[in-house]
């Protein structure tokens, strides 16, 4: 009973519209404190979420539930997440091929969440989603996002956190706002394609956690991106235990 109560507290904390007071976010580095968090309709992220942004640096996405998950359950969840990731990789590979020479920064990789469960990280370069300086999805964005929405709808026991990033050009306030607006635009597109709002969350990180140097145009282009973390939801974890 105590375990379930602790899990419920973690879920409520993550689902808050402005969760900066939650313990899940206390591991943010100094620059991460400038990030903006957006609320999904229904308050989104559930038990399995907790991947670290930036490959081990930065902000916790969600709550740690620790010993509530055994090794056997972790293996079962890993099998399901591997299958979902492979399906998503195949779908998005078609987008790369169809796009030809256009900027098609699309990366699908396996990551771990804070509970050491397998999760999926999708990286989308801003050039395939938005026009420069805009938070309005471009027509080209449909090709990738429609496939991600389909994948999420086919795997209803997973949750997704959408995180927007910018380069360091311009003011911090502007970049924080733009990154959140872009994350929300992607989240709202997924909702429009039938993904339940209760499974989704959006967050803006601004120029935090760059993946390349902002000293060059190529590096800044890499830093302007949207990342989508797909993790095991509460029901998937319960079913696996």
What are these regions (language model features)?
Residues 107-109, 119-129, 159-163, 189, ...:
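Soluble periplasmic/extracytoplasmic beta-strand elements of cell-envelope proteins
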Residues 17-21:
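C-terminal motif of bacterial Sec signal peptides marking the signal peptidase cleavage site
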Residues 24-91:
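Short, low-complexity, glycine-enriched hydrophobic/amphipathic alpha-helices that associate
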Residues 82-116:
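Amphipathic, membrane-active segments
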Residues 1-11:
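Bacterial N-terminal signal peptides that target proteins for export
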Residues 111-146, 167-173:
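Short, solvent-exposed beta-strand/turn patches at coil↔beta or beta↔helix junctions
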Residues 97, 129-163, 191, 221, ...:
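Periplasmic peptidoglycan-binding/anchoring modules of Gram-negative envelope and division proteins
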Residues 165-238:
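Periplasmic OmpA-like peptidoglycan-binding domain that tethers envelope proteins to the cell wall
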